[in-house]
Amino acid sequence: MTNAKINSGDPHPRRRVAVLDTEMSYVDTGEGDPVVFLHGNPTSSYLWRNIIPYLSELGRCLAPDLVGMGQSGKSPASTYRFVDHARYLEAWFEAMNLTSNVTLVIHDWGSALGFHRATRYPKQIQAIAYMEAIAMPMRWEDFGEVEPIFRRLRSEKGEQMILEENFFVERILPGAILRKLSDQEMSAYRAPFLAREARLPTLVWPRQIPVEGEPADVTAIVESYGKAMSQSALPKLLVVGEPGAILRGRILESCRKWPNQSEVKVKGLHFLQEDSPHEIGAALQEFVKSVPQK
């Protein structure tokens, strides 16, 4: 299974739906209880292309592109804070009529959005699988060797790095994957951000990371859902990257205390789906089969 091919091509057609003042693009394949895949920065539903096939015979697999990302429309007001994405995503959940037995498969900022939703609508969620997640507010020491980069992104230098150099896509993304992405894969990740002004979401996201109490609103949200998850009996699957990037050290040890949780280790840095999609897919398949039906 480890030697299975990682496909550059994405076999899943995209649909579109109106949400608030824009449109969102999404994958919708399979039938049954919904399994919702949520990506983060600077990726899209393309991240899940090799994983969705493992679940599409077990349920209805949905993977949206967050607003301003992937093939989704932009925010007309250019508002891409966490609370803005949460608002758009809530409208998308309503449009999809996802009100019960939802399994969330979440990564990066998609994890924050997913945990937040699970905390607000616990009766709608059946299970959560998470990887390289934003599980608790961070300290600068948690960033390790990339601390200087993220400090710069949160300073006035961030505009040059992101808007002019497309830094998140060109440097951070490939630098957080063990293997070398193909030209086709890099083209897919670049596609939403070819224009300077289109890169704004990838600049706002690193400035939303809750570090040392800032921004205050995101810090409060992350603290709240972290506490909720630490007390929740919801079935959980923790996918640990080896060596991983953001979910390690004290944060990983804290997550390991969450109840009703199983754990699987896969090779990878931050974008585990690009290094170990088949291992993740197989683990998710087993996890979804094991979750008691409501």
What is the predicted function of each stretch?
Residues 44-45, 112, 269:
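A short, glycine- and basic residue-enriched loop/turn
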Residues 2-15, 19, 24-26, 34, ...:
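Flexible "cap/lid" subdomain of the alpha/beta-hydrolase fold that forms the substrate-access gate
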Residues 27-71:
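Conserved HGGG/HGGXW glycine-rich cap/lid loop of the alpha/beta-hydrolase fold
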Residues 39, 107, 270:
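Histidine-centered active-site/metal-ligand motif
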Residues 269-281:
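Catalytic histidine-centered segment of alpha/beta-hydrolase-like enzymes
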Residues 50-51, 250-253, 279:
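A short acidic, amphipathic alpha-helical/loop segment
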